[in-house]
Every structure is written in structure tokens, then in C-alpha cells.
Amino acid sequence: MQKRIYVSLFFLVFFLSKISVVLSKDDGQRHGEDSDSMNKYNYIYRPNADNGIHNNLRPSSYIDMEHIAKGRDNTSGLRENELFDIQNDENSNMGPDQEKVITLSDKIYIDKIKNIIEYRKWRAKSKYRSPAKQPEEDMFVEGYIPIKRRDDNLLPHEKAEKDFEEIIQKYVDLENKLQKQKELEEAERRKKKLDDEQKRQKDLEDTNRKENDEEQSYKKLEDLELENIDTKINNNDTYDVENGFNDDNKLYTKINKIVSQVSQNNELYVNIMKYITLVYTSHVDIKQDDFTNGSISIFLTFENPKMGNDLANINISFFASEQRTGTNEVAEARSNYLTNYNMNELLEDNASGRLLSQDEYIKELVKYNHSISSSNKENLKNENYDVNMNISKILQYIIDNDINLVDNFITFNRTNEQEVTISKLDDFLHECSKVKPEDIKKDEIQKIIKTINKKEQIIKEVKNSLIKKDIEKCKLYTTILMFGSSIYSSIKYFFLLMLFVIYIL
């Protein structure tokens, strides 16, 4: 019995395979003659299809039909993003006389394919597409032809990403440009700083070299002067005129006359050197054991005032050398005082061409000494310095020039801070002795005499009035001497004594 059932089922299946229910004439063509096309479709869109049998083309529920109308089929496993190229199979392999019968399956199949194609065309044109899997090609179709990706056909997020990358690249390029410019500016700044430093070093070297050259020239000049002085001392020469390159007897004669005239008034210039030497020795003790040698040089250079330069340059150079205690080293120091003098003013002061007299020279010397002493007092802060300088200089001048102390003793009367007048002692005594009778007040004189019983006190008061240049007191005590004593008869002796006392002071 069981064998019979199996045989019956076999013949049934065989019969159905030979005599199938054909719903349309193109079913056989679709699954027989055009099976390759259907297999291609099933391979692409229906991988789960069963050898071309329309298992997935049966009528579906309303939800499935809605999905199909929207281009989606959840049951078919349709891949929307794959490239496809579907030929219209409904008219393929049909003869001209063959009748076309549209079945329900064909209707569903055709509507589904049309909806899918329309949906994909709309998606291809829409800007809200999903990104393609391959970056070099667009996975959508436009008229069944694959289209390449274009910049104007990018998706919104891709375009925004590309714009962002372009902006970032611009910022990167700008940053690189600014960094390069900054490096160039830094290199230029360093180069300028290096050039400035080199220039400063060069200027400093030039200045030092110039100072060294000047110092060497001064030292050579000083050595020549010392050598010349030593030669003159050895030869016992009073003056000398050095020969130049071009012989000019007339010019030599003029220079010889100048030297001769200066040598005849040697005391005038010696006193100037004495003053400068006194200033020098007030700061440098030349009697110390470590002192070796020193020098004072005075240079006066000038040109023809008509050439436009009417200034005479005065250079006073001071030099000192000392031996280091306990060593073989020698310390040397040099300093120069540079100034200038207007030659036109000098020529105007000496327009007559004559030399100053002794009195005129003394007057100028006192003015100069007062100005120098004032400056030294400010610099040295020594209140006795200028006083000692004045007394020493005046007494030295009196001794060197053999001035008669009786006839020519001079006194200095300071009229203001800048001028000092000179008067002889006999002029002051003559003025002091001018006493009129009506000026004598006997009562006052008697009162003073009672307080001063000794003549030594009267003489002391007279001396103080002479020293202080108090003409009123001098007249008063001179009158006392004339009125109440015989000392007045020997007043000349008294004044000589006063001169001696003043000189001793």
C-alpha cells in the first residue's frame, strides 16, 4: 500500500511538471525561455528566490503593498544602494503575433519594478540622499546609467565637511605664512642687532685707538721736551731757536727777538709756573719716596684770525709717575686741560703792542688769582687754601722783584666780588693822617686815653686799623697819638715797624 502511494505521488509530480497551469503565455517564456533574465533579477534583487519561482511575488498584505509603493520590500531583502541595470522583461522574447496576458502576478511585479525605478530616480535627484558606499562613484542611477560623483552633487554633510576642510586648510596656510614671516622678521632683527653690535664695537675700538694715539703723541712730545730741556741744561743755554725744514732768515730773526724779549722778563712767566707748580704739589707730594717724576706742559696754538679761526687752543698737561711699593711696577697718570681763547680779544687788549707794566701785571695777576682761588675753594672745600695762596704769591712776588717795602708796599682793596684795587701804603697813611681841627673831639679823646694807658695798646689799635683797612679807626688813633703823646714825632718809624710786622704775618 505504501509503495502505491509513493508511485502515485511520483506520477503526480511528473504530470504537473509536464502539464503546468499556465496563467499567461509569457509565464513559460519568463521561466523557461527567458529564465536567464529572471535568474539575473533574482540574483540581484531576490537572493532568496527559488529558481525563478514567484514565491516573493504573491499578493501581500496592505502594509506590504504600502512598502512596495514607497519602493521598499522588507520580505524581498532588496538592497537599495546597489547599482542595478534591469531590462524591461515584460516585452522580451515575445513574437509579434503572440498574445500578451497580464496576470495578477505580472501586475504586482510590474508595479513593483516601476515604483522602485521611480523612487530611485527621485532619490538620485534629491539632495537628501544617503551616502554611497564607494567614494569614487555614486550608487544611484539616472536613466539607468551610473553617474560619477561631482562637487555640486555632494551630500550636505559631505559638502559641509569639504568646506570645513578647505577652511582648515586656509587657516593652516595662513598660519604657515605668518610663521614664515615671523621667522624672517626675527632673522632680520637678529641680523640688525648683530650689525649694531659690530658697529658699536668698531666705534669703541676706533675711539680707544684714537685716545691711545693721542696719548702716545703727547708722551712723545713730552719726551722730546724733556730731552730738549736736558740738552739745554747740559749746554748751559738760556734760549734756543730750533731750525725748521725751510730756511728763512727773516723769520728766524723775528723768533730770536721774541725769545730774547721773553728771557729779559723771565720773572713774569716764572711766577705763572710757580703758581701752577704750587697747585700741582698741593695734590701730589713730590717729596715722597715712591714719586719718580712729573711734568707740567703748556701749549698755545693759534692760526691767522683772518682765515676764519680766531680761537687759540690752550692745552695744559699734567703728568706724574710713582713706583709701586714693594713691586717693580710703575704707576703713571696723565690729564689734560683743554680750553680756548679769542685771539681778537687778545689783540685788542694789546693793540699798542707794549708789554704790561709791573703794576698792570700785578693787577691782572690778582684778578686771575682771585678767580682761580675761588674755584679751588669750591673744589677743595678748604677755607685756608685761597688765603695761603694769595699771601704766598704776593710775598714771593715782592721778594723776587726787590720791591721797596717803604715806598711801594701795596694793599689790596676788594671793591666787589670780581674786582680788586691796589693802593700803596703811603697813600693809605696820607689819607689816614688827614685830620682837621674841627674833627678832633677832646672829650672823646680824653675818655679813650683814660681807658688806654699804655702806648702799646694804641699802637696795636693802629696796626689793626691798617690790617683791616679801617680808615676811621686809623684817623682816630692817629689823632690820639698826635694829641696826647710825643710818639707822633716819630710816626714814620712807627709805620716802618708796622710794615715789618705785616710782612712777618
From Swiss-Prot:
According to its UniProt entry, what is the function of this protein?
A: Involved in ookinete evasion of the mosquito complement-like response, oocyst maturation, sporozoite development and infectivity.
TM ranges = 485-505
Q: What is the effect of changing residue 217 to L?
A: Prevalent in Kenyan and Tanzanian populations
Lineage of the species this protein comes from: Eukaryota, Sar, Alveolata, Apicomplexa, Aconoidasida
Protein's name according to its UniProt entry: Ookinete surface protein PIMMS43
Give the keywords, sorted: Membrane, Signal, Transmembrane, Transmembrane helix
Topological relation to the membrane, as annotated: Single-pass membrane protein
Q: Where is the signal peptide?
A: 1-24
Localization in the cell: Membrane
GO cellular component terms listed in the entry, alphabetical order: membrane
Q: Where is this region: Disordered?
A: 188-221
**Subunit notes for this chain?**
Monomer. May form multimers with an unknown protein(s).
Mention any additional remark: Addition of antibodies against PIMMS43 to the infectious blood meal significantly reduces transmission of malaria parasites by A.coluzzii mosquitoes.
